[in-house]
A protein has these predicted regions:
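N-terminal pre-P-loop "Q-motif" helix
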Residues: 2-14
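Walker A/P-loop nucleotide-binding motif
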Residues: 21-38
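A short hydrophobic beta-strand->loop->alpha-helix junction that borders the nucleotide-binding pocket
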Residues: 52-61
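Conserved NTP-binding/hydrolysis module of P-loop NTPases
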Residues: 61-90
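Conserved Walker B catalytic segment
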Residues: 101-166, 174
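Conserved small helical "lid"/interfacial subdomain of P-loop NTPases
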Residues: 180-202, 219
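Amphipathic alpha-helical "lid/sensor" segments that cap RecA-like P-loop NTPase cores
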Residues: 198-249, 266, 310
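C-terminal leucine-rich, beta-strand-based interaction scaffolds used for sensing/assembly
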Residues: 249-371
Length: 371
């Protein structure tokens, strides 16, 4: 599987996990983590690897259902310890909720023992790995993240993970190697635009999307329809637009993973109105004690809704920040307000240096990319 943005350097970095310890990809929703995981799977398959892929966001429901989903992803022909533990996990998972914890433990032992099948090495690829904590509410699995981490650490090669919550992952598995997904550069976006036959400045597209592939893809689709960038951004950020819906989903997910739902919305609104505020300034704006605001900020930092630099607070996802300013205030944003926001955003874009633009174009000439 390949996406519309060729990220060969990142793919090469990820592929190093085929002969090393587990590697965790991190980044906000829409950063391209899943696309890169699938690109790695395809690259490994061309080299003779078999893969076991599981999306824990969908699979980590009840213990027995989780185990059955994971077992269904295993290849036929397993032998030795891996096969024995897989049979045990299957038997226990069919015993109902009383055996759920033991079934999960048997599955984790299966993963730890996966090595080869029919002479082909096995890659274990787990998307949204921190979702394993969804099982912690079931009997016997309160600390399920510990044996999960131990099972992964026992694998000498071919283990790839991804998460939208790097703060949670660092707390659970501090020794896990990580690779943060960087935003797309203006040059990369310029190159992709040229492959689509578009004349658009990469810096403007980078400003409009903050470099995140999900947003950039939406905007490029509209540009292909002949729409100007500011108009495309405003149209897709209007209620029901794809930018608006993507941000709304991310906003709700982050709040549900955080704590203090109502007041956390107020904190996000304050930071959206003015980034770079410190604790003292936020206390004044929100009318709560420093201790209370510090707690809310800590919870939002923990789910990577916000980041901090020199004790000042910023959004991880700049497009989400603008969505909060426009749509999280209780009244409907007008078309004029949304378009003005788009124009203000694009006014901050620095032109892409000519040499960089030419280099980007040459890298993409003759390439056809599909999603």
């Amino acid at each position: 599987m390949s996406g519309p943005f060729e990220r060969s350097e990142l793919l090469a970095e990820v592929k190093r996990a085929q002969e090393g310890p587990p590697l965790l990809l991190t980044g906000p929703p829409g950063a391209g983590k899943t696309t890169l995981l699938h690109a790695a799977v395809d690259a490994l398959a061309r080299e003779g690897w078999h893969h076991v892929y599981l999306d824990l966001l969908a699979a980590a429901t009840s213990p027995e259902r989780f185990v059955q989903s994971a077992l269904a992803a295993l290849p036929d022909g397993l032998e030795g310890r891996a096969a024995a533990r897989a049979r045990e996990a299957d038997h226990l998972s069919r015993g109902g909720r009383r055996e759920g914890a033991r079934a999960v433990q048997a599955l984790l032992s299966t993963w730890a023992a996966l090595d080869t099948v029919e002479g082909r090495p096995i890659a274990l690829v787990l998307d949204e790995a921190t979702e394993i904590r969804s099982l912690a509410y079931f009997s016997g699995l309160r600390e399920v993240d510990a044996p999960f981490g131990a099972a992964l650490a026992a694998r000498p090669r071919g283990t790839l993970l991804a998460t939208s919550f790097p703060g949670v992952a660092r707390k659970l598995w501090p020794h896990l190697a990580t690779l943060a997904m960087p935003p797309l550069s203006a040059a990369e976006l310029q190159g992709e635009a040229r492959t689509r036959g578009l004349r658009v400045d990469g810096s403007a597209l980078a400003a409009a999307s903050f470099g995140w592939p999900r947003y950039a893809r939406i905007l490029l689709d509209r540009l292909e329809q002949g729409m100007a960038l500011a108009t495309a951004w405003a149209d897709e950020m209007a209620l029901g637009g794809r930018l608006e819906q993507a941000c709304r989903h991310t906003y709700e997910v982050l709040l549900l993973r955080s704590r203090g739902y109502g007041m956390s919305k107020a904190v996000l609104a304050a930071v959206a109105a003015e980034e770079g505020l410190n604790l003292t300034a936020l206390v004044v704006r929100l009318g709560r004690t420093p201790g209370a605001i510090r707690d809310y900020l800590g919870w939002l930092l923990a789910v990577d809704a916000l980041r901090t630099t020199r004790k000042r607070y910023y959004y991880v996802d700049g497009v989400l920040r603008l969505w909060v300013r426009l749509h999280a205030r209780g009244v409907r944003a007008s078309e004029e307000e949304i378009l003005a926001c788009a124009r203000e955003l694009l006014a901050t874009a620095a032109p892409l240096p000519a040499a960089e633009a030419v280099a980007a174009a040459s890298r993409h000439q003759g390439l056809m990319e599909i999603d």
